[in-house]
Amino acid sequence: MALEGEDVRDYNLTEEQKAIKAKYPPVSRKYEYLDHTADVQLHAWGDTLEEAFEQCAMAMFGYMTDTGTVEPLQTIEVETQGDDLQSLLFHFLDEWLYKFSADEFFIPREVKVLNIDQRNFKIRSIGWGEEFSLSKHPQGTEVKAITYSAMQVYNEEKPEVFVIIDI
């Protein structure tokens, strides 16, 4: 298990990528990757449910690239809703994945959940980042889809979430 804030994947960064990484303060990491047959399970946690969702989004993006090499040049907002906390987490991650894979090729350095309405299962979030570029960002593993398989949301004293991503 990685320590909080520790980079868990080796992207063999160039000097230029290391310089970008050194330019900005590191973003808190409260997540880990768990082995799963043919896929990857994200485990994220936080002091609040909002932080656990944020960390899960960053775990997903951290699997695709070293988010420390991303500069916060643009801002993107994502709002979505679900029928319960699990579907809310699914749609939240799916909307962020869409921003990366189909829409603007946006990769965030940081995602912040502004609000989770637990009564109506709505979420508002914002991300700071830039357009993904292979010449600038190290390539990790493509995330094809979010799955409901074995998804868990624990909204207790220490909120945590588990999500399997299709790679």
Curated annotation (Swiss-Prot):
> One Pfam family for this entry, by name?
Archease
Modification N-acetylalanine occurs at: A2
A single Gene Ontology CC annotation of this entry is: tRNA-splicing ligase complex
Gene3D superfamilies membership: Archease domain (3.55.10.10)
- Superkingdom assignment: Eukaryota
Q: Which InterPro entries match?
A: Archease, Archease_dom, Archease_dom_sf
UniProt key word DNA-binding: no
UniProt keyword list: Acetylation, Calcium, Metal-binding, tRNA processing
Q: Name any Gene Ontology BP term.
A: tRNA splicing, via endonucleolytic cleavage and ligation
The free-text function statement in the UniProt record for this protein reads:
Component of the tRNA-splicing ligase complex required to facilitate the enzymatic turnover of catalytic subunit RTCB. Together with DDX1, acts by facilitating the guanylylation of RTCB, a key intermediate step in tRNA ligation.
Q: Which family does it belong to?
A: Belongs to the archease family.
Q: How does it assemble?
A: Component of the tRNA-splicing ligase complex.
Q: What name does this protein carry?
A: Protein archease
Q: Please give the organism.
A: Bos taurus
Question: In the UniProt record, what gene is named as encoding this protein?
Answer: ZBTB8OS
